[in-house]
């Protein structure tokens, strides 16, 4: 694979850039003039590269099925961490399994950019980056790392719920329903009323963009400079249907406990919002915002690094979900 011709910023997807735009460099790389090409071939390219990534693989402690590598920024260069070092970035190459696996980095990058640019959802800073052989990878800046290298405390919702593979089995991340996230926030977050609308908006976004892998570990609370907690920036957003045959929701019971999960998906969203203490106006405003922005979505999709075939699949999935939300919403 050769390096692609770059016409859009691989960070913001803004037109007219042959590498990262100044906006992207400021947001993602603290203003450093980082190149969009890494000084490595992709994993499994040759023995030397393989050994390098195998060493790094032992050092990263973030769980998940997709391989992730820890990277730090040294002057204007990104490199894999050495023993005893702590990375400020996570690098996610093309995974070794899954349908359309080569599209996963561009899928996650696009979905994260749509969340931020179209719907003003706070997200982890991110960009697309390329190995020397032209293979793409997704890179994201860790929001739990301070400027001095120390860490903000972060608790994902599986930890808050006391769920581990030992206590709840291998499927622990996917058990239950999204109402449980709301209830956990009420217990652990004094600023709950400020954060609940953000969580609700993110859940609607995940539905609209077919993110069927939004499990308990993909939501977190993050320590603030004041020493209290808030909902962390969104992360791991992508259209999972492009890669696996997925359900509408990651959690086994969907939005609500099975005893309450009646009616259309939109009626269930309204009931979930009621449990969360959101007013009808708040819900209407969130739904109105989330079901608008088609032109902006189309523009970012067109600028994205997805293949033309997958761009079409992505758009069709979005339109199908949008129709479900808008038709029913207009009827209520």
Protein language model features and the residues they cover:
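ATP-dependent phospho-/nucleotidyl transfer catalytic cores
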Residues: 132, 137-208, 256, 268-271, ...
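C-terminal regulatory or interaction extensions
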Residues: 151-152, 163, 238-246, 277, ...
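A residue-level signal for conserved active-site and pocket-lining positions in enzyme catalytic cores
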Residues: 71, 115, 157, 213, ...
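A conserved long alpha-helix in the C-terminal portion of kinase-like catalytic domains
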Residues: 194, 245-297
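Conserved ATP-binding subdomain of kinase catalytic cores across diverse folds
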Residues: 48-169
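Conserved kinase catalytic-core segment
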Residues: 103-119, 176-243
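Short alpha-helical scaffolding segments that buttress acidic/His motifs in well-ordered protein cores
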Residues: 199-203, 287, 300-301
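Regulatory N- and C-terminal appendages and interdomain linkers associated
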Residues: 1-49, 55, 228-229, 298-332
